[in-house]
């Protein structure tokens, strides 16, 4: 039997350094024999996307007595993307084998990945050429992150032994059910979700008006045919509803190849009158 590799891993998240998800993930990985460095926001930073801190100082410090003592842990006042940048360029003496982000408390499915700090932390690793993994538990209330952490350990070992030809970000959503109720693992494509957005008008104790973003998710919307997506592969939203672990490969390049081809083929820009 091939011995398990000892991997150099960076772990971050957007739920903050004290969240149960990142603690379970990091402790599970170090217990499996890996070298683990944790750099996380010092507070909740969900839905911050890929924002960076550019106009105020970033403060960071070593965190003790939160994780397994074998783990080097830091908290950072910045965003999830800041945390990964800081880890790669100010904390770790060499780049990690993989960047992991999570385990997030709540799903990151469909177009939600565009807002997700969890996915953006992993995307920062990918931008640096490091294979990266974003892990999310499909529940905002469940508290058992162990099945997700165990799957993460299994996945990084598989990725090490069978690497893809190019670095990829894997967005992985794990059902919040007992391990025996997980239906399996599915390769998925990104779905399309929209929300019924509501800005609730409220007033603070001083009578000043403010707004609170609320709303509910609208059912998944079919994606247009011109995207030429492989319909045989289910969306992450569909497979997650059936209690599958979903694995969606993502990239940072947002170029609309279909749009480029149409514009080039029709000489569309030739008709732009700009003197």
From Swiss-Prot:
Its cofactor is a divalent metal cation. It is an enzyme of class 3 (hydrolase). InterPro entries: SurE, SurE-like_Pase/nucleotidase, SurE-like_sf. One of its GO terms (molecular function) is metal ion binding. It is found in: Cytoplasm. A divalent metal cation binds at residues 14-15, 46, 104. Transmembrane segments: none annotated. Binds 1 divalent metal cation per subunit. Its EC number is 3.1.3.5. Its main location: cytoplasm. Keywords: Cytoplasm, Hydrolase, Metal-binding, Nucleotide-binding. Belongs to the SurE nucleotidase family. It comes from the Bacteria. PANTHER family: 5'-NUCLEOTIDASE SURE, 5'_3'-NUCLEOTIDASE SURE. This is 5'-nucleotidase SurE. The keyword Cytoplasm applies. One of its GO terms (cellular component) is cytoplasm. Pfam families: SurE. Coiled coil: none annotated. Nucleotidase that shows phosphatase activity on nucleoside 5'-monophosphates. It catalyses: a ribonucleoside 5'-phosphate + H2O = a ribonucleoside + phosphate.
């Amino acid at each position: 039997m091939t011995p398990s590799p000892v991997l150099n891993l960076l772990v971050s998240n957007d739920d903050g350094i004290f969240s149960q998800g990142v603690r379970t993930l990091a402790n599970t990985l170090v217990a499996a024999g890996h070298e683990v460095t944790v750099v996380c926001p010092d507070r909740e930073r969900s839905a911050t996307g890929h924002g960076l801190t550019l106009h105020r100082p970033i403060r960071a410090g070593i965190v003790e007595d939160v994780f397994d003592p074998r783990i080097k842990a830091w908290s950072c006042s910045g965003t999830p993307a800041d945390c990964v940048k800081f880890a790669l360029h100010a904390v770790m003496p060499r780049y990690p084998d993989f960047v992991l982000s999570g385990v997030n408390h709540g799903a990151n499915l469909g177009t939600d990945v565009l807002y997700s700090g969890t996915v953006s932390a992993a995307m920062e690793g990918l931008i640096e050429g490091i294979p990266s993994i974003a892990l999310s538990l499909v529940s905002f209330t469940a508290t058992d992150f162990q099945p997700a952490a165990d799957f993460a350990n299994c996945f990084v070992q598989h990725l090490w032994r069978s690497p893809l030809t190019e670095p990829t970000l894997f967005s992985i959503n794990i059902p919040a059910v007992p391990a025996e109720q997980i239906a399996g693992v599915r390769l998925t494509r990104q779905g399309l979700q929209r929300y019924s957005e509501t800005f609730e008008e409220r007033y603070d104790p001083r009578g000043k008006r403010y707004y609170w973003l609320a709303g509910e998710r609208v059912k998944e919307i079919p994606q247009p045919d011109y995207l030429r997506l492989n319909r045989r592969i289910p969306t992450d939203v569909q497979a997650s509803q059936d209690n599958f672990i979903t694995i969606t490969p993502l990239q940072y390049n947002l170029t609309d190849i279909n749009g480029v081809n149409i514009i080039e083929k029709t000489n569309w820009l030739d008709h732009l009158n700009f003197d």
